[in-house]
Amino acid sequence: MVVKVGINGFGRIGRIVFRNAHEHSDVEIVAVNDPFIEPHYAAYMLKYDSQHGNFKGDVTVEGSDLVVGGKKVRFYTERDPAAIPWSETGADYIVESTGVFTTTEKAKAHLKGGAKKVIISAPSADAPMYVMGVNEKTYDGSGMVISNASCTTNCLAPLAKVINDEFKIIEGLMTTVHSYTATQKTVDGPSAKDWRGGRTAAQNIIPSSTGAAKAVGKVIPELNGKLTGMSMRVPTSNVSVVDLTVRIEKGATYEQIKTAVKKAADGPLKGVLAYTEDDVVSTDMNGNPNSSIFDAKAGISLNDHFVKLVSWYDNEWGYSRRVLDLISHVAKVDGNA
């Protein structure tokens, strides 16, 4: 059974989720809402993308709706989530990708329009967070609003799970070397809450904060309080990389750690965690659907208890694929797929 999905917010993640759904046979996008663009512009932005190339399919406009691959997709321009008539489109699951309605109270407004569940494509202060390959099996159908966490947490958590399961993490620090995003500046500009964040993204390496490492403690309770981290925003348009440095309780050589990660990548975490020994660079990961691609050649160890691990992620494409995977999983648990 195909799960019918609506998207609120047709920005980077909203559009990349749509593109991924085109390759995701058990999910169908039936409606999109964005109050800041009209249908012809939405069609244009879906069709052409500077990072991921042209859309693989026909995109046209019929009246006020999109037609994608011959199928009509209702298009709305409501500012209030409660006013979006999801029920008339058949959309049961809503991807909340505006970056604005990230709390349970705000996101549940979609339920008034007939939606059954809301999946926030961002970290949430109070909604339950699920990371595919890590804790999605704890979902029991009770939450009306859930979060897919962040792209960085989706990269970090599967790797941290493998290391903790096999060797027990005592404590660790994470740095994500992260491509610039839409919230940053093309030229220096005002940013009262984050002065460094107001500097031009194209010329600077910008230290920034991230809650991604601490969020791992929410999806892997055993690691709560054991990890924290920061971000370095760099002048690349897409693809990021996690540097995880940990102390482990059970001594292991770097070769043993590589073996454990490869076993997980080829087994229970296949499709979420990948493993490579190639001499890759960031652009090689553009469009990679995995949450986390472990770079076996990039990591180092000081001794058998102190190690630095490196894992890549396409912070747009891989994350958006997990949003859809989470929806598919949730729908099956709910009995709607």
Swiss-Prot record:
Q: What is this protein called?
A: Glyceraldehyde-3-phosphate dehydrogenase
Where is NAD(+) bound in this sequence?
Answer: 12-13, 34, 79, 315
Q: What is its EC number?
A: 1.2.1.12
* Pathway listed: Carbohydrate degradation; glycolysis; pyruvate from D-glyceraldehyde 3-phosphate: step 1/5
For this protein, the record's InterPro entries field holds: GlycerAld/Erythrose_P_DH (IPR020831), GlycerAld_3-P_DH_AS (IPR020830), GlycerAld_3-P_DH_cat (IPR020829), GlycerAld_3-P_DH_NAD(P)-bd (IPR020828), Glyceraldehyde-3-P_DH_1 (IPR006424), NAD(P)-bd_dom_sf (IPR036291)
Annotated site residue numbers, Activates thiol group during catalysis: 178
Q: Which GO terms describe its cellular component?
A: cytosol
UniProt keyword terms in alphabetical order: Cytoplasm, Glycolysis, NAD, Oxidoreductase
Question: GO biological process: what's one of them?
Answer: glycolytic process
Give the matching Gene3D superfamilies.
Dihydrodipicolinate Reductase, domain 2, NAD(P)-binding Rossmann-like Domain
Q: Which residues form a coiled coil?
A: none
